[in-house]
């Protein structure tokens, strides 16, 4: 029955909560580079369903995914409460206001040394919309140059170059030429008559202008991603299920979902079977193991507690 399943999920959460704490510590290690995103879900509150938000943070290098939920809020406090005193190297997001304090010493001292990245794929999507829905041909030059930058990244991936070599190439002449072309066209379009542009083109230009530095922060370090696709893929199960009337009966239900999705998504990112991992994890728990570091997906095959 649903009650039996709910009770088993609650009992499992007691131990998986501690595993998520361990995974969070790994994901937020000093100088980590992370991706972050959020998506909405329906949660029952006071006899009605309310639009609430589930957040996700991904550390690609450590192959860890953490979902977090705080009373359904999409406010900045949810992110700052989760990050705590983490000393991140960089955080990638979209241009949502809850992230803009990252790396801004005037807005917060805590994360002033963290590079805030804004997804270049989001920038591209706005120019695609200007071209397709706004019919604005002037978007083409922006799309050509942005697509050129993405082609470079695919080449680097195919060649499997080191992070250091990727940094060197990102700061080379081909990238600089594309950025110079983008900047020149951006400044030219911003000076042109507003009436000549579609509303979508104005939105794309203003977005690129506002987040220029953040969109091109990726060239500073070969470890930095060019887009936020990693986090967006992680939240996709929520967006897919939402179309099939996914909802949670309470905040507690959403919190439980965050725990299980954190574990399952982390295991999948590591190319493992979620069922296989959960079986080994709970076998270790039933046999008395409480060394949660040894029970992480990265280490469970090496666990000495059997």
Regions found by a protein language model. Give the residues of each.
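Catalytic center-proximal scaffold of phosphoryl-transfer enzymes
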Residues: 1-306
